[in-house]
Amino acid sequence: MNKHWIRLGMVALLLGSMQISQPMQAQEVAREAKLHTYVMENPYDVPEIKAPKGKKVKNVVLMIGDGMSLMHVYSAWTANRGKLYLDNSQAVGLSKTYCADKLITDSGAGGTAIATGQKTKYHYVGVDPQGNELPSLITLSKQKGMSAGIAVTCRLWDATPADFCCHNVDRDDEYDLVADYVECGADYVVGGGAEKFENRPDGRNIFQELEAKGYQVARSWE
């Protein structure tokens, strides 16, 4: 199969929106598009995986592609010749992502909906529209005697991870969000943003407070 069929970009959209009376501009767009085109030389194989019969699910890993929409999924699907590991999902659904007070959500309200099952206001983290704290998947898991943790590639005070452990009406209240990790109860937390855990304006050292609760604090992978 010719690899060039999966060139991704805005070429078709841009050329389609141009009038036929502008051939020179259309050619320029086509030339520029080559600078913004991705070609996947070696697509990966996606084996078919089925859930074993007669066995219950023991562990759940919730993966959030922050900001990922159907457009991103479809682009990846197209680049890999119409195959993704997502195709092995036992159940696939869609959600309406608007928040309680806006048509377009943010990571605070959107992540809260995922973490707690309840919609809230724009910029709110782990609280309902009235500002009341909501129990997250972390909290509910611990109440059932299960282990629960968070591992992120961003800062821990970013709204998406904070939605699972923190409670605030402002996702930008970074020092307060970080302080909430002391009472989060998660067994395992990995992420960035160490500067907000120590040398804080309020004089607290969140690392020391976590250690006092029995956590082992590591500042490197070694």
What are these regions (language model features)?
Residues 1-10:
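Bacterial N-terminal signal peptides that target proteins for export
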Residues 13-16, 60:
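Generic secretory/membrane-interface signal
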Residues 9-12, 56:
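Residue-level detector of transmembrane insertion/anchoring sites
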Residues 6, 22-25:
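Intrinsically disordered, low-complexity segments enriched in glycine/proline and serine/threonine
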Residues 15-23:
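C-terminal segment of classical bacterial N-terminal signal peptides
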Residues 25-200, 204-221:
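N-terminal catalytic scaffold of extracellular/periplasmic and nuclease hydrolases
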